[in-house]
Every structure is written in C-alpha cells, then in structure tokens.
C-alpha cells in the first residue's frame, strides 16, 4: 500500500508541475517582451554522456525567436520532445535570459508561480531519489515505468527569476564536487559493496570483491582521524554574472536554463544589458584567480577519493 501511495504521489506531483509550467509559459507569453538572448549548445548524443568536453560551439538566438526557444525549454520534460539521437541521460541546457516588462499584479503572480514550481520540483526529486528508497541504478526503470520518457534532470532543474538587474554577463565555470569524509565513512561505504558482490566493468564478482577488499585494507591502514575527500570534476557549466545597480552588488548564478528577468518599470527597472556567451575552448581558459591547490594523495581513483595532508 505504501508503494502504491508513493506512485500516486509521484504522478500527482508531476501533473501539478506540468500544469504549473504551462501556466508559467502562458503567463510569460502574456507579458511584453523587452529583450531576449539565449544560446543553444550542441546535443549530447547517446553513449557520449561522459565524454570530456574540450570545446563547445554556441548558437545564439535573439528577440522573439529566443523567447519562443526559452518557453519551449521550460516545458521540455520528455525524450519524445527531442531528437532520437540525443541522450536522455544528459540534461538539455539553454543558457541566456528573457526580459519582460511587468506591472504589480504580473510581478506578484509570476514570483508566486515560480515559487510553486520550484517547490514541486524539489518534492518530485525527493520522491524519486529519497522516498523511493532505490539506488541510482534502479531509479531510471522505476520512474520510466510510471512516467515513460521523463528526463529527470530537466524536471528537477529550478527556475531562476530576477528583478531589475542592470547587466547580465555569461561565461563558463569549471568546478569540482567536493565531499569531506572520515576514514570510518569510507570503510562503511566499502563494506556495503563487500556485502553485495556483483560483476562490475568487465570484472567477475570474485575479481570485484578482491578489488574492494584491497581498497578496504588500504583505507583501514590509515589513522582514524585521516582527512579524506571526494573531489570529482563536473563538466564545464554555463554561468551568469548579474550586476544589481541599486545595491551595487554582483551575484553569480548557474545558468542551465534562461534566466527570467522581470523589469518593473514603475520601480526604476530598465532593460538590462545582456552580454554574449562565447564558445568554450578548454585549452584557452583564462582564470581570473586560481588559488593554490591543496596537495592530495589519490587513494581510490574510481571514487575520486583522496587523502588530504
């Protein structure tokens, strides 16, 4: 019964999200467009999700064409809405911004709707990743049994609504996911793998068990207070650096989707200056400031697990 209730909540939450996104699309379409600039990125083909991205060619859309692309993007939730060659495991990214003139009622309604949408997205992600109780390897099959073709990364992605920015500049960010762990944390993680042996990456169960045992012994030999961390690179991401003139501050936002910019003209909101997103070339990245990296010792390459001094 509990599993049935969870599936019911999954479906109800998704339908509410789908309806709210269409309401947002229609609400924005009713507003007066001031400016729009979005940047299409190349499709990620099936089987190439984990290939390193050394270059990214950007195609720009402006004005009405950009607005239409942005509104389609916000409701792009299923693989049936895209090319058969495009991977369903890679989220579709469309950095940029769409700027609308709004009055008091529109401003309040759009902010309230965005808050509702983002709450539903969080709720949907919680149902799938936590309440289902399923490991990541089994979630895909479970979700697609009830919502065939759903691109979960697109469904989870939150909307970003900005008020009266002065300028928007776009660029690329190279980041790492860093998670600090204790020795006992890692040992517990490896123990779970030892208790459920399986064939992985061309290795037999016995070979995989032997590898896990060696990894366990290497970690167990460290002092109990050893500082361990997972430092895993993530693919280069588009970002927006937004300047707010009224309070003289700059804020950086992740920008996988178009920023929704509301210009409240009666409150001094003018059309912002929207910059360009240039092509990405890994060999020509220039860092404004690159702090000295901490010297780390690799412990388990497959986990990106390091020993910190």
UniProtKB/Swiss-Prot annotation:
Entry superkingdom:
Bacteria
TM helices/strands, residue ranges: none
Q: Which InterPro entries does this one have? A: DNA_replication_term_site-bd (IPR008865), Tus_dom1 (IPR036381), Tus_sf (IPR036384)
Q: Where's it found, cell-wise?
A: Cytoplasm
- One Pfam family recorded for the sequence: Ter
Gene Ontology MF terms:
DNA binding
What keywords sit in the KW lines?
Cytoplasm, DNA replication, DNA-binding
Q: What's one GO BP annotation on this UniProt entry?
A: DNA replication termination
Q: GO CC annotations?
A: cytoplasm
Q: What is its main location?
A: cytoplasm
Report the NCBIfam families cross-referenced here.
rep_term_tus
Q: State the family it belongs to.
A: Belongs to the Tus family.
Per its database record, what is this protein's job? Trans-acting protein required for termination of DNA replication. Binds to DNA replication terminator sequences (terA to terF) to prevent the passage of replication forks. The termination efficiency will be affected by the affinity of this protein for the terminator sequence.
List the HAMAP family hit by this protein, alphabetically. Rep_term_Tus (MF_00483)
Q: What is this protein called?
A: DNA replication terminus site-binding protein
Q: Which species does the entry assign this protein to?
A: Cronobacter sakazakii (strain ATCC BAA-894)
